[in-house]
Amino acid sequence: MSKILFFMCVIGCFMPATLMAKVEKVTLKGVIKGLGNEELILMNTDQSEIVRTKTKNDRFKITAEVETGDLRYYMLYAPSVGPLGPSMSIPAIYFFIDSPEITIGAELKNERINIKSLKGSPGRQEYDRIMASLPSASRVEEIYDNYNKAFHEYNEVSQTPENMKKLKAASQAVDALQQQRREEIFGLLPQYTNSMPFAVIISSYFGIDNIDEAEKVWKQFDPSIRYCYALKQLEDLIQRGKSCAVGHEAPDFELMTPAGEKIKLSSLRGKYVLVDF
């Protein structure tokens, strides 16, 4: 344990302070066309609230103290437009706060907020550059537009066999595109082992079902950027995956019973327990 702590200390000493996560006062400002005079909430990705404001004629300005430097996502959410739950239309946008001032240009349309421009974020600029460099980039908009149109025609207009056929074809095109983009992104890994924006991109492809692959990718990133939020989350995923492997002791967790009481898995030690996921 002492060797691990010493190694972490050495890494920390040689990292420029400006590159590490820290609490910093920042300003977010901009325009969300079509929002009018509504409440806007700055949130963490776990949906915990940071600060609220109210737009005035589509315009907003927020000053807050947040963690910066590790390229974590933040979210702006307009609660009056719709919920954050699973939906094709969510009135929220995600972005990095990696400089003291971020300027956002966005538009509210069909209960969705779409970013049109974002200034002041080097991380977002590099993220967009990498994604635009993919051979498949020129086809993304067309394929997703076709899918959204087919989805609308079948679910909102008429559930005919012809519309179902179009929806299936559009869905298959999306699946093929996603597979191609995955292969292109993984092929770029050797070039971007020091890139936090690339770490954000590639880490989105991992879940609890491909832990071994996730660990191989995580190990290829330079230790100097492993404080990156995406890589820390990936590391946590790997550790949780290993602890849940067959033959390992199940991690302790707490659930609410139908009677409103809290119960821990560890309190049932020595008993047969069925855990239904």
Predicted regions and their residues:
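Bacterial Sec-dependent N-terminal signal peptides
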Residues: 1-30
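A non-transmembrane, solvent-exposed segment enriched in polar/low-complexity residues
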Residues: 20-172
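N-terminal targeting or signal-anchor segments and their processing/structural boundaries
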Residues: 20-23, 242, 276
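A glycine-biased structural micro-motif
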Residues: 37, 247-248, 270
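N-terminal targeting signals for export/organelle localization
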Residues: 87-90, 103, 176-245
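Conserved hydrophobic/aromatic pocket- or pore-lining residues that grip, position, or stack substrates
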Residues: 201, 253, 275
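N-terminal "domain-start" segment that seeds a small globular fold
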Residues: 232-266
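Short active-site neighborhood of thiol/selenol oxidoreductases, capturing the structured segment around
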Residues: 264-277
